[in-house]
């Protein structure tokens, strides 16, 4: 049986979206959906530690990182569990999300249920920016929109 989750992204500005998650038993998580209101180009896309949006996206804390690793790209061995890389918005400001990730999960120790999905202002440099901030956040900049990931039917 597949596990499913959903996240509605909202921010202070125009950025909004809906992201769906689906995981078949012990398989990778399929992440799909769309985000609108973005500037054209790449935007960092991460699961953050807390499902707390009481002070907007800032109260979601750092990237979800239960293994205490450095920030990296989604295909890197050295990465936070929540590091999903970038989503790319076209000229229309819409990013179509289609990601398959074997590290995040909808159950167990790496479960993202109840945590916050965040889309960032700038591209994620995937930990290769050559400075300390790169190894923590990928220099992805401010948090444009976020939402808590919840269980879906």
From Swiss-Prot:
GO terms for biological process, alphabetical: removal of superoxide radicals
Binding site for Zn(2+): 63, 71, 80, 83
EC number: 1.15.1.1
PTM sites of type N6-acetyllysine: 122, 136
N-acetylalanine carried by residues: 2
GO cellular component: cytoplasm; nucleus
Keywords on record: Acetylation, Antioxidant, Copper, Cytoplasm, Disulfide bond, Lipoprotein, Metal-binding, Nucleus, Oxidoreductase, Palmitate, Phosphoprotein, Zinc
Cofactor binding summary note: Binds 1 copper ion per subunit. Binds 1 zinc ion per subunit.
PTM description: Palmitoylation helps nuclear targeting and decreases catalytic activity.
The keyword Transit peptide appears for this protein: no
Compartments, record wording: Cytoplasm; Nucleus
Classification via Gene3D superfamilies: Superoxide dismutase, copper/zinc binding domain (2.60.40.200)
Keyword Oxidoreductase on entry: yes
PROSITE patterns: SOD_CU_ZN_1, SOD_CU_ZN_2
Cofactor(s) demanded: Cu cation; Zn(2+)
UniProt-annotated stretches for the region Disordered: 59-79
Modified residues (N6-succinyllysine): 4, 10, 91, 122, 136
CDD domains, alphabetized: Cu-Zn_Superoxide_Dismutase
Lipid-acceptor residues (S-palmitoyl cysteine): 7
Tissue: Highly expressed in liver. Also expressed in testis and to a lesser extent in kidney, lung and spleen.
Subunit and partners: Homodimer; non-disulfide-linked. Heterodimer with SOD1. The heterodimer CCS:SOD1 interacts with SLC31A1; this heterotrimer is Cu(1+)-mediated and its maintenance is regulated through SOD1 activation.
UniProt xrefs under PANTHER family: SUPEROXIDE DISMUTASE CU-ZN -RELATED
Protein task: Destroys radicals which are normally produced within the cells and which are toxic to biological systems.
Protein name according to UniProt: Superoxide dismutase [Cu-Zn]
Phylogenetic classification of the source organism: Eukaryota, Metazoa, Chordata, Craniata, Vertebrata
Chain's gene name: SOD1
């Amino acid at each position: 049986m597949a596990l499913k989750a959903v996240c509605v992204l909202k921010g202070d500005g125009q950025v909004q979206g809906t992201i769906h998650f689906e995981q078949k038993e012990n398989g990778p998580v399929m992440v799909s959906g769309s985000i609108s209101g973005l500037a054209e180009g790449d935007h960092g896309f991460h699961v953050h530690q807390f499902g707390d949006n009481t002070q907007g996206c800032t109260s979601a804390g750092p990237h979800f990182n239960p293994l205490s690793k450095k920030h990296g790209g989604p295909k890197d061995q050295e990465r936070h569990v929540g590091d999903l890389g970038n989503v790319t918005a076209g000229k229309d400001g819409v990013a179509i999300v289609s990601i398959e990730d074997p590290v995040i999960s909808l159950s167990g120790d790496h479960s993202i249920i109840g945590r916050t999905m965040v889309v960032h202002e700038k591209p994620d440099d995937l930990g290769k920016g050559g400075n300390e901030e790169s190894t923590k956040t990928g220099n992805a900049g401010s948090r444009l929109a976020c939402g808590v990931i919840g269980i879906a039917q």
